[in-house]
Swiss-Prot record:
Binding site for substrate: R99, R109, R138, D227
Biological pathway: Amino-acid biosynthesis; L-leucine biosynthesis; L-leucine from 3-methyl-2-oxobutanoate: step 3/4
Catalytic activity of the protein: (2R,3S)-3-isopropylmalate + NAD(+) = 4-methyl-2-oxopentanoate + CO2 + NADH
UniProt protein name: 3-isopropylmalate dehydrogenase
Keyword RNA-binding recorded: no
Principal location listed in the UniProt entry: cytoplasm
One Gene Ontology term of the molecular function aspect: NAD binding
Taxonomic classification: Bacteria, Pseudomonadati, Pseudomonadota, Gammaproteobacteria, Enterobacterales
Binding positions (NAD(+)): 78-91, 285-297
Quaternary structure, from the entry: Homodimer.
Gene Ontology CC: cytosol
Compartment(s) where it occurs, according to its Swiss-Prot or TrEMBL record: Cytoplasm
């Protein structure tokens, strides 16, 4: 078994650097417990790179990412860079560029609501008796975000804008296969989202997914229109297992579901390619308003490194170890401010990182 791994660490902007520091605490414990050599090297990305090197995605950063087994990403963007557009902006010039360069076509976003946090959900707890345990499988490099042509034309009252939604059969097949295989390891149910009563891309999407489902007879498939799916997620989120989405629909629905779970600060994200190379990041943004105040929730970032171990390094036992420590911290009542109830004591970013690292370490020593 390979015991040597290289991880490119891109802390970025806002709360990215401080939550990254908490992940290092976890990695230090894991390295000692499992006797594996994990080499982490930090590189600049996003606004941080713009300030120091004049570009959101330096060539030196790309070079090291190409030499690594996976990328641990923080966050990019902030008010001082909002005037920058297109490839000069932190978001498009860095994050979208990484996705495109490494063909990270599959975005996996687990949405999990722990029993201890049910009261934080905007939904009545009677609507979620079985909690929420969903994985969004979102196609990430096709659809209307990337289709050409797009732009603006005309003048005055005749000015107009246009975007093009395009999906190829192979793009749908590869993302659907990931969804079905994940479902086989879970509750064996896939909900595929489209708008096949209107959009030609959705008609092809439904056709391809239905055909592939024949290869997975043990998995139940249902098709839902996007508008119906958005209602069902509010009405009965517990019914969902794997939600398979085109790019735009997945972007919208996963954020809706993130709020149902109580706090986006709890949610990790993985973007992977066909070779299991991936970029792992918290689902939330850079949150510049709370940066360096030691109040950001590092759990999403810590769970992201768990996903990195699971999907890119194929070390599922380590991923489970990290996830159990997070669950234990919550059961013991530890809360950052975003998941603390009114009048409930909260702990800092650094304290949460220390506690989760200690729980991993102590379990080994028992």
């Amino acid at each position: 078994m390979n015991n040597n791994y290289h991880i490119a660490v891109l802390p970025g902007d806002g709360i990215g650097p401080e939550t990254t520091r908490q992940v290092y605490k976890i990695l230090n414990v894991i390295k000692k417990q499992f006797q594996i050599n994990i080499v982490t090297t930090e590189h600049k990305i996003g606004g941080d790179a713009i300030n120091s090197e004049g570009t959101p995605f330096p060539k030196s950063t790309l070079k090291y990412c190409e030499q690594s087994n996976a990328i641990l990403f923080g966050a990019v963007g902030g008010p001082q860079w909002t005037h920058l557009k297109g490839s000069e902006s932190p978001e498009q010039g860095a994050l979208l560029a990484l996705r495109k360069h490494f063909n990270l076509f599959a975005n996996l976003r687990p949405i999990y609501l722990a029993d201890e946090l049910k009261e934080l959900s905007p939904l009545n707890i009677n609507m979620i008796p079985n909690g929420i345990d969903i994985i969004f499988v979102r196609e990430l490099t096709g659809g209307i975000y990337f289709g050409q042509p797009k732009g603006r034309s005309g003048t005055g009252l005749n000015e107009y804008a246009f975007d093009t939604a395009v999906y190829h059969r192979f793009e749908i097949e590869r993302i659907a296969n990931i969804a079905f295989k994940l479902a086989q390891k879970r509750r064996k149910r896939v909900s595929s989202i489209d708008k096949a009563n209107v959009l030609h891309t959705s008609m092809l999407w439904r056709e391809v997914v239905s055909h592939l489902a024949k290869n997975y007879p043990d998995v139940e498939l249902e098709h839902l229109y996007i508008d119906n799916a958005s209602m069902q997620l509010i009405n009965n989120p517990s019914k969902f297992d794997i939600i398979l989405c085109p790019n735009l629909f997945g972007d919208i629905l996963s954020d809706e579901c993130a709020m149902i779970s109580g706090s986006i600060g709890m949610l990790p994200s993985a973007s992977i390619n066909e070779h299991n190379f991936g970029l792992y990041e918290p689902a939330g943004g850079s949150a510049p308003d709370i940066a360096e105040k030691n109040i950001a929730n590092p759990i999403a970032h810590i769970l992201s490194i768990a996903l990195l171990f699971r999907y890119s390094l194929k070390l599922d036992h380590i991923a489970i170890k990290i996830e159990k420590a997070v669950s234990q911290a919550l059961m013991l009542g530890y809360r950052t401010i975003d998941i603390a109830k009114k009048h409930e004591k909260s702990i800092s970013t650094n304290e949460m990182g220390d506690i989760i690292a200690a729980l991993i370490k102590n379990e080994r020593e028992k």
